[in-house]
Amino acid sequence: MQLLNNWYSLLLTEVAAYFTSTTLFVSILKNAPSLSWLMKYGGHDNFGLKPPLIATKLEVPKRWFWHFYAFISLLNPLFTFFILNTNFPIPIFKNIKEDLMYSKKLQVLLLIYEIHTLRRLYENLRFRKSGSKMLAGHYLLGYLFYTHTFLALLLCGRRSYENTMSSMQFVGLGIYAIGSIWQNASHEHLIAQKNHSQYLVLKKGCFKWITGPHYLGEIIVYTGIALIAQHWLIWLVLGWVLCNMVAISSSYACTVKNKEQSLDFRWTLIPFLY
């Protein structure tokens, strides 16, 4: 039991440290103009700043985003199947198996996260015409983020064996569904834009009021997941998502403004706030 507790504490500390440190790092970079090139998101303007030459040599196609979603969409069910169909005497594996079998909360979280990543995989595969580039570091961070989020979901389900979901968890499930529908609708507009030979001004749906509604959709999805999980570790995940979406939506808004040359006011990410 002591070994199990040590492993749990170590994993909990590592995952918490990852999300805390990366969130702080992104926050610092966003407020450090000379380092803002590290935040350069494929296809977005970098507020007029050019990255060092070596950074341009360490870029990969932005369409490789689909690799993250394929990876986590396979990891989730394969890990679950592996744990449920093996009988390792190692305490930590036995405990995870019990959680997967008896924690309704964990079962729901892994299911909706699988649905989310499969949807994002489908959308990204349809986005593969993009010729934009992203920093190789962002590519590696993608794998780290989804791996750590998966670990966070497993950790928050430890010995959480409630038979029924609370009213707040049902609210979270509804928010997750709204966020998924919102984000998918936004991505469909973006996919339609990509299929045009010339830049298409997006003014339909949520794009009437918000420059980057697809980024807001990501925040809504993870807010729903956090309400279902009801664990402080998932709130750290949401904090990372919020910080990252604010940074990305800022550069995206700059890109859209330069391409559209429009005087119409739209919120960047969150209506009435930003």
From Swiss-Prot:
SS bond list: none
Entry membrane topology: Multi-pass membrane protein
Entry's localization field: Endoplasmic reticulum membrane
Entry keywords, A to Z: Endoplasmic reticulum, Membrane, Transmembrane, Transmembrane helix
KW Endoplasmic reticulum (keyword) present: yes
Keyword Membrane: yes
GO cellular component, one term: endoplasmic reticulum
Single Gene Ontology MF annotation: polyprenol reductase activity
Family indicated by similarity: Belongs to the steroid 5-alpha reductase family.
PANTHER family registered for this protein in UniProt: DFG10 PROTEIN (PTHR14624), POLYPRENOL REDUCTASE (PTHR14624:SF0)
Name the UniProt record assigns to this protein: Uncharacterized protein C7D4.09c
Organism name: Schizosaccharomyces pombe (strain 972 / ATCC 24843)
